[in-house]
From Swiss-Prot:
Belongs to the PlsY family. Its main location: membrane. Catalyzes the transfer of an acyl group from acyl-phosphate (acyl-PO(4)) to glycerol-3-phosphate (G3P) to form lysophosphatidic acid (LPA). This enzyme utilizes acyl-phosphate as fatty acyl donor, but not acyl-CoA or acyl-ACP. GO terms for cellular component: plasma membrane. The chain crosses the membrane at residues 6-26, 58-78, 82-102, 116-136, 157-177. It is found in: Cell inner membrane. The keyword Transcription regulation does not apply. This is Glycerol-3-phosphate acyltransferase. Disulfide bonds: none annotated. The keyword Transmembrane helix applies. It is a multi-pass membrane protein. It holds the Pfam family G3P_acyltransf. It comes from Ruthia magnifica subsp. Calyptogena magnifica.
Length: 197
């Protein structure tokens, strides 16, 4: 198969993998309310934690992370360069945020992005995690931890990989994460965002 055609097939596969909603599947497995209609109405690990507890949330987090990692690992196996892999990450992320299987209404994409980062540049992924944990311990607000980690991720990525073209794609994803967190940002500005218990 021609490399260009193979890349298009991989992008399509990545979008479909991203479109699998771990939160919805986990909620059905544990007989929990639909995460799209309960809590924050977001099919993500944080909302599953609210409505279903730590076990269900952990499975959701791992599942969403694997969704991000698997397409990256496939791209590595097929020997695509880093720029192409970052486009794979973007498409997988878009699958999570706009899943074809669930009326294009998905999660916010942080866990899927993190899983992809760990597979692409584990030092960048670890830097994201360390930042998130530090901010969460100090400020005790999950969304703010995610947003601060997201802001710093392109800096970490460029310093670690020295790949400017790929960094631009990472910046695009990070901007999109801010877009998916609009409601959180409004609550943060109004001092109404929930804190981590």
């Amino acid at each position: 198969m021609l490399p260009e055609l193979l890349f298009i097939v991989l992008l399509l596969l990545s979008y479909l993998i991203g479109s699998i909603s771990t939160a919805i599947i986990v909620c059905k497995m544990f007989n929990l309310p639909d995460s799209r209609t309960q809590g924050s109405n977001n099919p993500g690990a944080t909302n599953v934690l609210r409505i279903g507890g730590k076990k269900a949330a952990a499975i959701t987090l791992i599942g969403d992370g694997l969704k991000g990692a698997i397409p990256v690992l496939i791209a590595h196996y097929l020997a695509f360069n880093m720029l192409n892999v970052t486009w794979v990450i973007l498409v997988t992320f878009l699958g999570h945020v706009y899943p074809i299987f669930f009326s294009f209404k998905g999660g916010k994409g942080v866990a899927t992005f993190l899983g992809a980062l760990l597979a692409l540049s584990y030092l960048t992924g670890l830097s994201f995690i360390i930042t998130w944990v530090f901010v969460a311990k100090v400020l005790k607000i999950s969304s703010l931890s995610a947003l601060i980690s997201t802001v710093l991720t392109p800096v970490y990525f460029y310093l670690i990989t020295n790949n400017l073209a790929s960094t631009y794609v990472i910046i695009l994803i990070c901007l999109w994460i801010f877009y998916t967190h609009q409601s959180n940002i409004k609550r943060l500005l109004n001092s109404q965002e929930n804190k981590i218990n």
